[in-house]
Amino acid sequence: MARRSKGRFIDGIVLLDKATGMSSNFALQRVKRFFNANKAGHTGALDPLATGMLPICLGEATKFSQHLLDSDKRYLVTAKLGQRTDTSDSDGEVVQTRPIEFTEAQLMSALEHFRGDTLQVPSMYSALKYQGQPLYKYAREGIEVPREARPITVFELNFISLEGDELTLDIHCSKGTYIRTIIDDLGEMLGCGAHVIMLRRTQVAHYPYDKMVTLEQLEALVAKAQEEQLDPSSLLDSLLLPMDTAVADFPEVNVPDASAAYLMQGQAVRVSGLVADKLVRITLGTERRFVGIGEMNEDGLLAPKRLVVIHDQAKAS
Protein backbone atom coordinates (compact mmCIF):
# COMPACT_ATOMS: atom_id res chain seq x y z
CA MET A 1 0.00 0.00 0.00
CA ALA A 2 1.43 3.39 -0.99
CA ARG A 3 2.31 5.70 1.87
CA ARG A 4 0.17 8.81 1.96
CA SER A 5 1.97 12.10 1.41
CA LYS A 6 2.26 14.40 4.40
CA GLY A 7 1.08 17.96 4.00
CA ARG A 8 -1.45 19.50 1.68
CA PHE A 9 -1.55 19.65 -2.08
CA ILE A 10 -0.63 23.23 -2.88
CA ASP A 11 0.87 24.33 -6.18
CA GLY A 12 2.78 27.56 -6.78
CA ILE A 13 6.05 29.43 -6.45
CA VAL A 14 7.33 31.46 -3.51
CA LEU A 15 9.97 34.08 -4.24
CA LEU A 16 11.99 33.80 -1.05
CA ASP A 17 14.46 36.50 -0.06
CA LYS A 18 17.07 34.23 1.55
CA ALA A 19 19.01 35.69 4.46
CA THR A 20 22.76 35.35 4.84
CA GLY A 21 24.18 32.57 6.98
CA MET A 22 21.66 29.87 6.09
CA SER A 23 21.78 27.11 3.52
CA SER A 24 19.30 27.03 0.66
CA ASN A 25 18.03 23.65 1.86
CA PHE A 26 17.35 25.02 5.35
CA ALA A 27 15.36 27.87 3.79
CA LEU A 28 13.49 25.40 1.58
CA GLN A 29 12.45 23.23 4.52
CA ARG A 30 11.21 26.26 6.47
CA VAL A 31 9.05 27.41 3.56
CA LYS A 32 7.70 23.89 3.05
CA ARG A 33 6.76 23.73 6.73
CA PHE A 34 5.09 27.16 6.78
CA PHE A 35 2.90 26.26 3.79
CA ASN A 36 2.38 22.68 5.02
CA ALA A 37 3.19 21.59 1.47
CA ASN A 38 3.47 17.93 0.55
CA LYS A 39 6.33 18.64 -1.87
CA ALA A 40 8.85 21.45 -2.37
CA GLY A 41 12.07 22.17 -4.23
CA HIS A 42 14.30 25.16 -4.96
CA THR A 43 15.65 26.25 -8.31
CA GLY A 44 19.38 26.61 -7.81
CA ALA A 45 21.17 26.93 -4.48
CA LEU A 46 22.60 30.13 -3.09
CA ASP A 47 25.76 29.95 -0.97
CA PRO A 48 25.16 30.50 2.78
CA LEU A 49 26.97 33.86 2.42
CA ALA A 50 24.60 34.99 -0.34
CA THR A 51 21.21 36.63 0.06
CA GLY A 52 18.35 37.30 -2.29
CA MET A 53 15.98 35.61 -4.68
CA LEU A 54 15.49 31.88 -4.18
CA PRO A 55 12.35 30.66 -5.97
CA ILE A 56 10.74 27.81 -4.03
CA CYS A 57 8.46 25.54 -6.06
CA LEU A 58 5.61 23.87 -4.19
CA GLY A 59 3.64 20.82 -5.29
CA GLU A 60 3.25 20.36 -9.04
CA ALA A 61 5.36 23.48 -9.67
CA THR A 62 8.42 21.33 -8.88
CA LYS A 63 7.94 19.71 -12.30
CA PHE A 64 9.05 22.96 -13.92
CA SER A 65 11.88 23.96 -11.56
CA GLN A 66 14.51 22.94 -14.12
CA HIS A 67 13.39 25.77 -16.39
CA LEU A 68 14.17 28.28 -13.64
CA LEU A 69 17.46 26.53 -12.89
CA ASP A 70 18.38 27.03 -16.56
CA SER A 71 17.32 30.68 -16.64
CA ASP A 72 19.43 33.85 -16.49
CA LYS A 73 20.30 35.33 -13.11
CA ARG A 74 21.29 38.79 -11.86
CA TYR A 75 23.55 39.57 -8.90
CA LEU A 76 24.84 42.53 -6.93
CA VAL A 77 28.31 41.70 -5.63
CA THR A 78 30.84 43.53 -3.47
CA ALA A 79 34.45 42.37 -3.58
CA LYS A 80 37.26 43.19 -1.18
CA LEU A 81 40.39 43.98 -3.15
CA GLY A 82 43.93 43.20 -2.03
CA GLN A 83 43.16 39.83 -0.46
CA ARG A 84 42.65 36.41 -2.02
CA THR A 85 40.99 33.60 -0.02
CA ASP A 86 40.92 29.85 -0.53
CA THR A 87 37.14 29.90 -1.15
CA SER A 88 37.05 33.19 -3.11
CA ASP A 89 34.73 34.64 -0.46
CA SER A 90 34.89 35.91 3.11
CA ASP A 91 34.04 32.48 4.55
CA GLY A 92 37.51 31.27 3.58
CA GLU A 93 41.04 31.83 4.85
CA VAL A 94 43.18 34.63 3.43
CA VAL A 95 45.94 33.00 1.39
CA GLN A 96 47.51 36.08 -0.18
CA THR A 97 47.66 39.83 0.47
CA ARG A 98 48.89 42.27 -2.17
CA PRO A 99 48.84 46.05 -2.71
CA ILE A 100 46.12 47.66 -4.83
CA GLU A 101 47.89 49.50 -7.62
CA PHE A 102 45.68 49.42 -10.71
CA THR A 103 44.31 52.51 -12.46
CA GLU A 104 40.69 53.24 -13.32
CA ALA A 105 41.47 52.54 -16.98
CA GLN A 106 42.97 49.16 -16.07
CA LEU A 107 39.87 48.30 -14.03
CA MET A 108 37.51 49.16 -16.88
CA SER A 109 39.63 47.18 -19.33
CA ALA A 110 39.61 44.17 -17.00
CA LEU A 111 35.83 44.32 -16.60
CA GLU A 112 35.41 44.29 -20.38
CA HIS A 113 37.28 40.97 -20.48
CA PHE A 114 34.42 39.24 -18.62
CA ARG A 115 31.55 40.51 -20.78
CA GLY A 116 29.99 38.31 -23.43
CA ASP A 117 30.68 34.63 -24.10
CA THR A 118 33.61 33.22 -22.15
CA LEU A 119 34.87 29.99 -20.60
CA GLN A 120 34.94 29.61 -16.82
CA VAL A 121 36.69 26.99 -14.70
CA PRO A 122 34.39 26.29 -11.71
CA SER A 123 35.70 26.85 -8.21
CA MET A 124 36.75 23.85 -6.14
CA TYR A 125 34.30 25.23 -3.57
CA SER A 126 31.20 24.42 -5.60
CA ALA A 127 28.48 21.76 -5.62
CA LEU A 128 29.53 20.38 -8.99
CA LYS A 129 30.36 16.69 -8.73
CA TYR A 130 33.49 14.75 -9.61
CA GLN A 131 33.22 10.94 -9.45
CA GLY A 132 29.98 11.29 -7.49
CA GLN A 133 31.28 13.69 -4.84
CA PRO A 134 30.75 17.48 -4.65
CA LEU A 135 33.90 19.44 -5.40
CA TYR A 136 33.76 21.26 -2.06
CA LYS A 137 34.27 17.95 -0.22
CA TYR A 138 37.55 17.42 -2.07
CA ALA A 139 38.52 21.03 -1.39
CA ARG A 140 37.96 20.65 2.35
CA GLU A 141 40.38 17.72 2.32
CA GLY A 142 42.96 19.75 0.43
CA ILE A 143 42.50 17.74 -2.77
CA GLU A 144 42.29 19.53 -6.11
CA VAL A 145 40.62 17.61 -8.94
CA PRO A 146 40.50 18.42 -12.67
CA ARG A 147 37.64 20.67 -13.81
CA GLU A 148 36.77 21.49 -17.38
CA ALA A 149 36.15 25.09 -18.41
CA ARG A 150 32.47 25.63 -19.15
CA PRO A 151 30.88 28.16 -21.50
CA ILE A 152 29.06 31.03 -19.79
CA THR A 153 27.61 34.33 -20.93
CA VAL A 154 27.79 37.62 -19.05
CA PHE A 155 25.06 39.71 -20.66
CA GLU A 156 25.81 42.77 -18.54
CA LEU A 157 28.59 43.67 -16.13
CA ASN A 158 27.99 47.12 -14.69
CA PHE A 159 30.42 49.04 -12.52
CA ILE A 160 28.56 50.43 -9.48
CA SER A 161 31.23 51.82 -7.16
CA LEU A 162 34.79 51.62 -5.86
CA GLU A 163 35.07 52.82 -2.27
CA GLY A 164 38.47 52.24 -0.73
CA ASP A 165 39.23 48.56 -1.23
CA GLU A 166 35.60 47.55 -1.92
CA LEU A 167 34.38 47.14 -5.50
CA THR A 168 30.66 46.72 -6.24
CA LEU A 169 29.35 45.31 -9.53
CA ASP A 170 25.98 44.39 -11.05
CA ILE A 171 26.17 41.18 -13.10
CA HIS A 172 23.52 39.65 -15.39
CA CYS A 173 24.66 36.19 -16.43
CA SER A 174 23.67 32.80 -17.79
CA LYS A 175 23.05 29.68 -15.74
CA GLY A 176 26.07 28.01 -14.21
CA THR A 177 28.05 31.23 -13.77
CA TYR A 178 30.07 31.40 -10.56
CA ILE A 179 30.29 34.99 -9.35
CA ARG A 180 33.03 34.07 -6.86
CA THR A 181 35.13 32.79 -9.75
CA ILE A 182 34.60 36.01 -11.72
CA ILE A 183 35.75 38.03 -8.71
CA ASP A 184 38.77 35.78 -8.10
CA ASP A 185 39.77 35.95 -11.78
CA LEU A 186 39.26 39.72 -11.81
CA GLY A 187 41.49 40.12 -8.76
CA GLU A 188 44.25 38.14 -10.46
CA MET A 189 43.88 40.18 -13.63
CA LEU A 190 44.25 43.39 -11.59
CA GLY A 191 47.28 41.96 -9.79
CA CYS A 192 45.95 42.49 -6.28
CA GLY A 193 43.65 39.56 -5.60
CA ALA A 194 40.01 39.84 -4.53
CA HIS A 195 37.25 37.92 -2.80
CA VAL A 196 33.48 38.25 -2.37
CA ILE A 197 32.25 39.89 0.83
CA MET A 198 28.63 40.47 -0.24
CA LEU A 199 26.56 38.63 -2.84
CA ARG A 200 22.88 39.25 -3.48
CA ARG A 201 20.80 37.62 -6.20
CA THR A 202 18.39 40.26 -7.40
CA GLN A 203 16.65 38.43 -10.24
CA VAL A 204 15.88 34.94 -11.54
CA ALA A 205 14.37 34.77 -15.03
CA HIS A 206 11.67 37.45 -15.29
CA TYR A 207 10.60 37.47 -11.63
CA PRO A 208 10.31 40.96 -10.08
CA TYR A 209 12.46 41.96 -7.13
CA ASP A 210 9.53 43.46 -5.22
CA LYS A 211 7.66 40.14 -5.04
CA MET A 212 10.19 38.56 -2.66
CA VAL A 213 9.26 37.65 0.92
CA THR A 214 11.49 36.76 3.85
CA LEU A 215 11.22 33.84 6.25
CA GLU A 216 10.49 36.41 8.96
CA GLN A 217 7.50 37.70 7.00
CA LEU A 218 6.18 34.18 6.49
CA GLU A 219 6.67 33.38 10.17
CA ALA A 220 4.81 36.56 11.15
CA LEU A 221 1.84 35.61 8.95
CA VAL A 222 1.70 32.13 10.49
CA ALA A 223 1.79 33.67 13.98
CA LYS A 224 -0.97 36.13 13.03
CA ALA A 225 -3.13 33.30 11.70
CA GLN A 226 -2.68 31.30 14.89
CA GLU A 227 -3.48 34.35 17.01
CA GLU A 228 -6.69 34.95 15.05
CA GLN A 229 -7.49 31.21 14.97
CA LEU A 230 -7.26 31.10 11.19
CA ASP A 231 -5.83 28.51 8.85
CA PRO A 232 -2.35 29.89 7.95
CA SER A 233 -3.05 29.11 4.30
CA SER A 234 -5.67 31.87 4.28
CA LEU A 235 -2.85 34.40 4.67
CA LEU A 236 0.06 32.61 3.01
CA ASP A 237 -1.43 31.37 -0.25
CA SER A 238 -1.93 34.87 -1.65
CA LEU A 239 1.88 35.13 -1.81
CA LEU A 240 2.15 32.24 -4.27
CA LEU A 241 2.87 32.92 -7.91
CA PRO A 242 1.14 30.65 -10.45
CA MET A 243 3.26 27.64 -11.37
CA ASP A 244 3.09 28.44 -15.08
CA THR A 245 5.17 31.57 -14.44
CA ALA A 246 8.15 29.19 -14.47
CA VAL A 247 7.54 28.65 -18.20
CA ALA A 248 6.04 32.04 -19.04
CA ASP A 249 8.47 32.50 -21.93
CA PHE A 250 7.07 29.41 -23.71
CA PRO A 251 4.40 30.11 -26.34
CA GLU A 252 0.90 29.09 -25.28
CA VAL A 253 -1.14 26.41 -27.01
CA ASN A 254 -4.78 26.30 -26.01
CA VAL A 255 -6.31 22.84 -26.38
CA PRO A 256 -10.10 22.77 -26.82
CA ASP A 257 -12.21 20.97 -24.26
CA ALA A 258 -13.06 18.27 -26.81
CA SER A 259 -9.40 17.17 -26.93
CA ALA A 260 -8.58 17.73 -23.26
CA ALA A 261 -9.29 14.19 -22.05
CA TYR A 262 -6.99 12.67 -24.68
CA LEU A 263 -4.18 15.09 -23.81
CA MET A 264 -4.45 14.47 -20.07
CA GLN A 265 -4.10 10.73 -20.74
CA GLY A 266 -0.76 11.43 -22.40
CA GLN A 267 -1.94 11.24 -26.00
CA ALA A 268 -0.82 13.66 -28.70
CA VAL A 269 -3.56 15.93 -30.04
CA ARG A 270 -3.77 17.95 -33.25
CA VAL A 271 -3.32 21.72 -33.09
CA SER A 272 -2.11 24.21 -35.65
CA GLY A 273 -0.16 27.40 -36.09
CA LEU A 274 3.10 26.71 -34.23
CA VAL A 275 6.61 25.73 -35.27
CA ALA A 276 7.64 22.10 -34.85
CA ASP A 277 10.24 20.99 -32.28
CA LYS A 278 9.28 23.81 -29.95
CA LEU A 279 8.34 23.50 -26.28
CA VAL A 280 5.00 25.10 -25.50
CA ARG A 281 2.87 25.94 -22.49
CA ILE A 282 -0.43 24.04 -22.60
CA THR A 283 -3.74 25.49 -21.43
CA LEU A 284 -7.18 23.91 -21.62
CA GLY A 285 -10.50 25.25 -22.82
CA THR A 286 -12.04 28.67 -22.43
CA GLU A 287 -10.69 29.00 -18.87
CA ARG A 288 -7.15 28.58 -20.25
CA ARG A 289 -6.15 26.45 -17.29
CA PHE A 290 -2.45 25.59 -17.29
CA VAL A 291 -1.85 21.83 -17.36
CA GLY A 292 1.79 21.44 -18.35
CA ILE A 293 4.25 21.67 -21.21
CA GLY A 294 4.47 19.83 -24.50
CA GLU A 295 6.26 19.76 -27.82
CA MET A 296 4.97 20.29 -31.33
CA ASN A 297 5.97 17.88 -34.08
CA GLU A 298 6.10 18.36 -37.83
CA ASP A 299 2.65 16.85 -38.31
CA GLY A 300 0.95 19.49 -36.16
CA LEU A 301 0.56 17.15 -33.22
CA LEU A 302 1.09 18.38 -29.68
CA ALA A 303 2.79 15.72 -27.54
CA PRO A 304 2.60 16.30 -23.77
CA LYS A 305 5.97 16.28 -21.95
CA ARG A 306 5.19 17.22 -18.34
CA LEU A 307 1.58 17.36 -17.17
CA VAL A 308 0.36 18.47 -13.77
CA VAL A 309 -1.74 16.29 -11.52
CA ILE A 310 -4.99 17.93 -10.48
CA HIS A 311 -5.59 17.13 -6.81
CA ASP A 312 -8.64 17.41 -4.64
CA GLN A 313 -7.19 19.63 -1.92
CA ALA A 314 -9.98 18.74 0.45
CA LYS A 315 -8.48 15.24 0.71
CA ALA A 316 -4.98 16.48 1.55
CA SER A 317 -3.90 16.29 5.16
From Swiss-Prot:
Its EC number is 5.4.99.25. SUPFAM superfamilies: Pseudouridine synthase, PUA domain-like. The active site is at D47 (nucleophile). The keyword tRNA processing applies. It comes from Shewanella sp. (strain MR-4). Belongs to the pseudouridine synthase TruB family. Type 1 subfamily. GO terms for molecular function: RNA binding; tRNA pseudouridine(55) synthase activity. PANTHER family: PSEUDOURIDYLATE SYNTHASE TRUB1 (PTHR13767:SF2), TRNA-PSEUDOURIDINE SYNTHASE (PTHR13767). Disulfide bonds: none annotated. This is tRNA pseudouridine synthase B. The gene is truB. HAMAP family: TruB_bact. The keyword Isomerase applies.
